[in-house]
Amino acid sequence: KIRLFNTQNGEIYVGLLDKVIQFCKDHEYSYEFIENKFYGLPFEVNDMISKEGVKDYMTSVSKYAPREYQIEGVYDALKHNRRLLISPTASGKSLMIYSLVRYHVERGQNTLIVVPTTSLVEQMYKDFADYGWDVGSYCHKIYAGRERETDSQVIITTWQSIYKLPRKYFARFNVVVGDEAHQFKSKSLISIMTKLGDAKFRYGFTGTLDGT
């Protein structure tokens, strides 16, 4: 059973914040947002991000020209710090993930990319190389039998390889990207996301949502 509200510490998932606000309004409760050193304020918007700037950036970091919907997706994600993006099969999802990762790496931030299978770890790594990046200098792959400790800025891993690791392992990550995000309802994946307490930037990609 998955509990969305922690009665011990009063925490609730930020994705439910709009429902909490509506509840307060319906019952005429007052509320206040207090700035957090990691997250800032809820619904924070990055005014420095522009669609034209995102287009130019994506073009500069990849040898493939981005499509309009890819630019729109990356722009929306960077503008709001956290987004769930619907990206069907063959829509160029990895280019969007790659662009987000490159943006954060250039700002000295560490990124954790979580995928469901070993083959997707390898595919993501290969795609990043195909886009023209020196992946060996920045990315580390984790799945069964591979070393989990690394100084690399970017880790591409299956969730099965890391969900049992202690919270301190996740402390260095500023960014998390979840592929096949519709699977993130499972307790193991929720455990990973909860341990990423310092990750202000959270992006999910999925080809489908089941409405739950």
Residue ranges and their predicted role:
Residues 2-6, 23-24, 32-34, 38-86:
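Conserved pre-motif I regulatory segment
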Residues 111, 118-145:
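Conserved helix-turn-beta segment of the N-terminal RecA-like "Helicase ATP-binding" lobe
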Residues 65, 79-104:
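Walker A/P-loop
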Residues 68, 94-99, 118, 187:
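Phosphate-binding Walker
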Residues 9-32:
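Structured, non-catalytic alpha/beta "coupling" segments that mediate domain-domain communication
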Residues 88-89, 94, 110-121:
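Conserved strand-helix element at the start of the C-terminal RecA-like helicase core
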Residues 159-211:
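SF2 helicase catalytic motif II
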